[in-house]
Swiss-Prot record:
Regions that span the bilayer: none
InterPro entries: rRNA_ssu_MeTfrase_G (IPR003682), SAM-dependent_MTases_sf (IPR029063)
Binding site residues for S-adenosyl-L-methionine: 96, 101, 146-147, 160
Keyword Cell membrane annotated: no
Enzyme class: transferase
EC number in record: 2.1.1.-
PANTHER family the record matches: S-ADENOSYL-L-METHIONINE-DEPENDENT METHYLTRANSFERASES SUPERFAMILY PROTEIN
Protein name according to UniProt: Ribosomal RNA small subunit methyltransferase G
Gene Ontology cellular component annotations, sorted alphabetically: cytosol
CDD domains with a match to the protein in the record: AdoMet_MTases (cd02440)
Function, in words: Specifically methylates the N7 position of a guanine in 16S rRNA.
NCBIfam families tied to this protein: rsmG_gidB
Keyword terms: Cytoplasm, Methyltransferase, rRNA processing, S-adenosyl-L-methionine, Transferase
Amino acid sequence: MSPFQNFMILEEKQLLILMKTNSEICKELVSNPEKFNKLEQFVSLVEEWNKKINLTGFEGENLWKEGINESFFCFEKILETKNLNDFENKSWVDIGSGAGFPIIPFAIIYPKINFYIIESNSKRVRFLELVNEKLNLKIKIFNTRAENFSELKFDFVSARAVAHLDLLIKYFMKITKQDATGYFIKGPKIFEEKEEINNKKISIETLKIDKIKEKNVFVVKMNRI
């Protein structure tokens, strides 16, 4: 086979990859048909409820791309810091979950983690409760604000584009156990926010999500010192 033919085959493979929809890419990432079916149900519920209330700006293929797949890429980065076994049977709370990203995809794929949600918007809570029931996810949902929450202390905490880093630190210190870890999904402004932080009780590590090419997305890993 000539080098030119090799090049043509490579070009064809790259074209096939580019032609895949984001839902097809997700199906390959997940591989488990039952879990992928739940993701499809979740996406359908988001699209249905988005017509009633302001859940998210994501729709169509972008819902798969920026909602589902980005959630998985973030969890892949998180798994570079700990083994999956470290999360099993531990408590993980997501603050301000809104339409359910990243917590619902996480809960679908990793059912052995005890997931919780803190969400202050009552309409979004009703949506999340419906998703929880329809998909049998067993997430515990609290309709309150993080600053008012005092019922439990968690092993892990996450939030996606919810608040300034300074406020996330306050939430982290209030609702987590002493040896807890925070994973906060942020955009490029995280570096400006870090410059404004002067808290010697917290260590912060910024992890770039390399698989997200179109924009800069980071997981901010947080621990007590």
